[in-house]
Structure formats: C-alpha cells, structure tokens
Amino acid sequence: MFFNSVINKLFIIGKEIQTMSSLFSLTLCFVILLVSVTKGYFVAYSLGLSLVILLVTFTYQGFPFASLLKMGYISSQKAFSIITILLLIGVVTSIWMASGTIPALVYYGTQFINPQYFILSAFLLTCIISVLLGTSFGTVSTVGVALMIMAKEGNIDPHIIAGAIIAGAYFGDRCSPMSSSAHLIASLTKTNLYKNLAYLMTTAWFPFIASTIVYFFLSLGNPIQATSHNLLAEIPQIFDINFLVLCPALAVFFLCLMKIEVKVTLAISIAIALFLGIFVQNYSWLQMFQVIVFGFHLHSQTQLAEALTGGGIVSMLRVSLVVIISTFLVGIIVGTKTLASVEKLFRRISSKSGLFLSTIAVGLVSAAFGCTQTLAILMTYQLMKDKYEQEKMSHYQLAIDIENTAVVLAPLVPWNIAGLVPATVLMTDSGFIPYAVYLYLIPVFNWIGFKFVELRMQRKFE
C-alpha cells in the first residue's frame, strides 16, 4: 500500500516536471520568435531553432525521436500540397510587374481617387488590388506605398491611412483565389476553395459596409491636400501603360468566375504576362526568365524602383520553408499533446457563439505566440478541429471560422509579421491598429450573427 502510494506520488511529480519542462520550452520558443521578429531576422531561423529545442525537450521526456519526426512529417505533408501554388503566386507577382500589369493597376487605380474621400478610396482600391494579387504584402508594397506617399504629401495622419491600406490588403488575403492563406486553410480542412470563398463573401458584407462608413467619416475629417506625386508620373515613362497589360489580371478574374482549377488559372495568367513582357514591354527572354526566378527589380534609384520590386520563385522558397517548418513544429506540439490542457477548456462549450468566441481567443493567442499568420492558422486548426467535429460542425464551418479569426487577427498583434511587415513597408508603426477597422469588425460581426441566431431560436422555444 505504502509502495503504491510512493509510486503514484512519483508519477504525479514526474508529470508535473514534464509539464513544466514543456511550458518552459514553449515559452523559450515564443521569446526566440519574438526577438527574431523585432530584430528583423528571417523567421525560418527562429522556427528551426524552436524545432530543435522541442525535439530535445520531448526526447528527454521519453518520446522516441523517430516518433517525433513522424509526427512532424505527417503534419508537414499538408503543406506540400500548396507549395506549387505558392511558387506560382511568386511568379505571378514578379511577372505582373514586368508585364506592366501591376504598374497599370496602380496608375489607373489612383486616377479614380477623390481627394475629399482619400482614406475611403485607399481602402476600396487596396481591397480590389488585393483580390487580384491575393497577397497582402504584395498589395501593400505596390499600391500601398504609392498611396502612403500621396497621403504624406497631403498631410494625412500616416496611422489612419496605413490602417485603411492594411485592412484593404487583408480583404483579398482572406478571400482571393490567389491567397496562400486561403489555399492553406482549404488544404488543412479538406474543403473546396471556391466554396470557401463564396461563404467568406457572405460573412464579409456587414463588416465591409460598416468599414466603408467609418472610412467615409474619417475621410471627411482628413481630406488630402495634394493628389499627384512623382511616383505616378514615373510609371508611364518606364512602362507601356495601356488596357492590354491588364489582360493577366482579367484572365485570373474570369477564369476564377468559371471555377477553373487555380494552378491552371495562374499558369494561363503567367503565359499572358510573359507574352506582354516580351512583346509590349520589350524585355528579352533571358530577362523574363530572371524575373520569374529571382523577382522583378528596376535598376534605377527612384521611388518607383523601391515600390515595384520582389516576387519570383526564390521569394516564395523562403515562404515555403516557413510553412513547412511551421507545420512540422505544430505536428510535434499536437502529437505530444502538449496543449491538451488548453483543449479541455473548450469541452463544456456547446453554442456556436461560444465556440466562435473560443476560436477568436485561440486565434489571437496563436497569433501572439507564433508571430506569423501561418502558425496562427495551423495552431488554431489543430486546437479547434476536434471540438468542431464533436459539435458536428462541418469542415466548411471550421474553415470559415479560421478565416474570420486567425487570418484577420494576426495583423493586429504588433509583433506578428502579418502586421509588422506591412507597417514597416509603409514607414509607420503599430499605431495603425485602431484604424484597421475591417480586421476586427469581421470577428465582432460574425460573433454577433451567431448570438442573434441563438437568441431567436431561444425565443421560438419559449
């Protein structure tokens, strides 16, 4: 009897030590990620170091090393399916610059801006461009930079305009057929991308309308004093700007409406842009090959050269590496049941509004801990999927809820690269967060929607 009591106590102490060592390792990983982001280091380095720390910790706790690698590999397989799409998106970004598509979108788009409603116009324009490009970073670094330069020249508060630009940039990052995060979530939840996008649009209307009203009143109080800048004047000097160069973007738009497979859509758009780059913009085949692989760069010391740069296969290799390491890392964390205590907190939740509120909390904490949008998505999925299955929620509901929480909340965490990088590109700081209205209205309105339906159902049965 005494012997059994001692064994039980030792077992409990051992479990407590194991839990403490896991928490210490996770905290250390968080600090490493945070330092990496604030210092501007490539996040894959900190993720790789975090992976080593967790492998050592769990091996010390008694998990077979081979089993840990298997957990990570099985999880990372989900990332492999979107690597091709990521690489194609990288090519699209660079080749659209070389073909004149992105310069034309910036040039024509800014022509429609009303000085009196500049902030509202900036939000709407970045929404449109982000849907076409499918990347928040690409939108911010092209049309976003042009708008910020115009805003600063017109004496508009940079935090307000940055908030409108970043909110608009994540409109497309959330619901564009070219969005890497949308593809990742569809892959994780085993759902159809186009069905997801249709559902996302239905949950976006009220937050979008409310955001436009807010930006309308902000525009009235902050009219721009100047609407032209050298940046826009440079575009037609360097590129042949005409409606023909918009064909790659139009191809994506119409092929997506026809629900053509995304890889085929991107490949067709790339082929059209390649033709335009060679025969309209007069680049050589070798130059276009370099653009496809290494990204687009203007060899001049101008503001346009700073704004129009990037893309290419190489740029997406870095992103792909982050996605693979992140999924590997999360696979080990989930496989070792390190966060089992967190999952227990959700067991008593049964209402849709309560479940969505839990997803918001998990998405926010994951965004704060992971420091990247990718980790926020992966951790939210892994922590919430069992509860959604338990409540007999469809995979589509889980996909939409992740889009409406982790995806849009990540940019609102000051040290998460989803918001830190766009803010840095726009030469501002976390002061943009209160003005990124659309990003926090998405989860708020969706929670209100769930709550409203529940209250109506309660009244029916009273």
Regions found by a protein language model. Give the residues of each.
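Interfacial loop-to-helix junctions that mark the boundaries of transmembrane helices
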Residues: S36-S46, I74-Q77, G109-N114, L231-N242, ...
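Hydrophobic mid-bilayer segments of alpha-helices in multi-pass membrane transport proteins
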Residues: S21-L33, G40-Q61, I83-I89, L244-F253, ...
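C-terminal transmembrane helix pair
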Residues: L188-F208, S350-E462
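Short juxtamembrane and helix-loop transition motifs at transmembrane-helix boundaries
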Residues: M97-Y107, L125-T126, P223-I235, Q397-D401
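Hydrophobic transmembrane alpha-helices that form the pore/transport pathway of multi-pass ion
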Residues: N114-T202, V362-N404
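Membrane-embedded alpha-helical segments and adjacent helix-loop junctions characteristic
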Residues: P64-M150, Q301-K385
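Transmembrane-helix bundle segments that line or gate the permeation/cavity pathway
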Residues: I165, Y170-D173, P177, F208-P223
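Transmembrane alpha-helical segments and their short flanking loops
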Residues: L184-Y194, N222-A251, I272, L276-F294, ...
